[in-house]
From Swiss-Prot:
One of its GO terms (cellular component) is cytoplasm. It is found in: Cytoplasm. This is N-acetyl-gamma-glutamyl-phosphate reductase. InterPro entries: AGPR_AS, AGPR_type-1, NAD(P)-bd_dom_sf, NAGSA_dehydrogenase, Semialdehyde_DH_NAD-bd. SUPFAM superfamilies: Glyceraldehyde-3-phosphate dehydrogenase-like, C-terminal domain, NAD(P)-binding Rossmann-fold domains. It comes from Thermotoga petrophila (strain ATCC BAA-488 / DSM 13995 / JCM 10881 / RKU-1). GO terms for biological process: L-arginine biosynthetic process. Gene3D superfamilies: Dihydrodipicolinate Reductase, domain 2 (3.30.360.10), NAD(P)-binding Rossmann-like Domain (3.40.50.720). GO terms for molecular function: N-acetyl-gamma-glutamyl-phosphate reductase activity; NAD binding; NADP+ binding. The gene is argC. Catalyzes the NADPH-dependent reduction of N-acetyl-5-glutamyl phosphate to yield N-acetyl-L-glutamate 5-semialdehyde. Keywords: Amino-acid biosynthesis, Arginine biosynthesis, Cytoplasm, NADP, Oxidoreductase.
Length: 339
């Protein structure tokens, strides 16, 4: 049985980890931490968890003694120093602190210096692309939600050199839970309900993460123009991607079917069928559709994920499974909730 700890257990991704891991046949939650609710039982704060473990302040000695793996479900910049205090524990960080190959990129976009970063054996935790490296990883940087939807949608096309990577346009829409569990006027019901708006246009911090991984796939310079939008729903991301090509839709579709043929969570839809966020609600599944705009030779790719599952906690559990030599679908086999 894998002994599991969660730091940040009362945020949305932390709570999703609790939900998934309580139903995992090979995992046992042995440590839960929350600075805000330390000293309380989790079910006192969130009765829906049915979890009577007592939340505590972060204690590296207790984590090292009681956990085989630790999930850090904290905002960017909060995990790095905590993780460096631990010994003999595998780490899966759901923030951005371990996602970048170059710490200078993190410093530029997140405003923090990561001292000693070059000494950490870390892997970018997108299983469909880095499965072999994840198997032996000590620290996994779990991908961001938007990058997961965009990278998986583009990977086959870039790998097979089917599209022009020079300029990739991404229009993405996310439910409000993607912003995390925090008090901010922008996320009040009256502000979000019956409204659709863009945010962080041309400056979202997920852009360098997308470009890093897409360039590794293509072997070429990639430029992503990314506009995210907030939509009045709780969960889900739908990314629509526009990229130039001189290939036929049939050839591209066949390449996608082949690329993802053995992937348990990635589903390439038949031509003419387009994905919906409702299809992956509460699950680790990804749905990818495509269409060709013949007049301009533009391939239009569409991908749908649940931002809290495949975009965060589900993918983290998938990474844990790989790190401990389990079938990566363990604890994640359930179908989406519909309607």
């Amino acid at each position: 049985m894998i002994r599991v700890g969660i730091i940040g257990a009362t945020g949305y991704t932390g709570l999703e980890l609790v939900r998934l891991l309580k139903n995992h046949p090979e995992a046992k939650i042995t440590y839960l931490s929350s600075r805000t609710y330390a000293g309380k039982k989790l079910e006192e704060v969130f009765p829906s968890t049915l979890e009577n473990s007592i939340l505590s302040e972060f204690d590296p000695e207790k984590v090292s003694k009681n956990c085989d793996v630790l999930f850090t479900a904290l905002p960017a910049g909060a995990s790095y120093d905590l993780v460096r205090e631990l010994k003999g524990v595998k780490i899966i960080d759901l923030g951005a602190d371990f996602r970048f190959d170059d710490p200078g990129v993190y410093r530029e976009w997140y405003g923090k210096e990561l001292s000693g970063y070059e000494n950490i054996k870390r892997v970018y935790g997108l299983p469909e692309l880095h499965r072999e490296e994840i198997k032996n990883a000590q620290v996994v940087g779990n991908p961001g939600c938007y990058p997961t939807s965009v990278i998986l949608a583009l990977a086959p096309a870039l790998k097979r050199n089917l599209v022009d990577p020079e300029t990739i346009l991404v229009d993405a829409k996310s439910g409000v839970s993607g912003a995390g569990r925090k008090e901010k006027v922008d996320y009040l019901f009256s502000e979000v309900n019956e409204s659709l708006r863009p945010y962080n246009v041309a400056k979202h911090r997920h852009v360098p993460e997308m470009e890093q991984e897409l360039e590794k796939i293509s072997g070429k310079k990639v430029n992503v123009v990314f506009t995210p939008h907030l939509v009045p729903m709780t969960r889900g991301i739908l990314s629509t991607i526009y990229v130039k090509t001189d290939k036929s839709l049939e050839e591209i579709h066949e390449a996608y079917l082949e690329f993802y043929r053995n992937e348990p969570f990635v589903h390439v839809l038949p031509m003419g069928i387009y994905p919906s966020t409702k299809w992956c609600y509460g699950s680790n599944h990804v749905f990818i559709g495509m269409q060709m705009e013949e007049r301009t030779n533009t391939l239009i790719l569409m991908s749908a994920i649940d931002n809290l599952v495949k975009g965060a906690s589900g993918q983290a559990v998938q990474n844990m499974n790989i790190m401990f030599g389990l079938d990566e679908t363990k604890g994640l086999e359930f179908t989406p909730i519909y309607p």
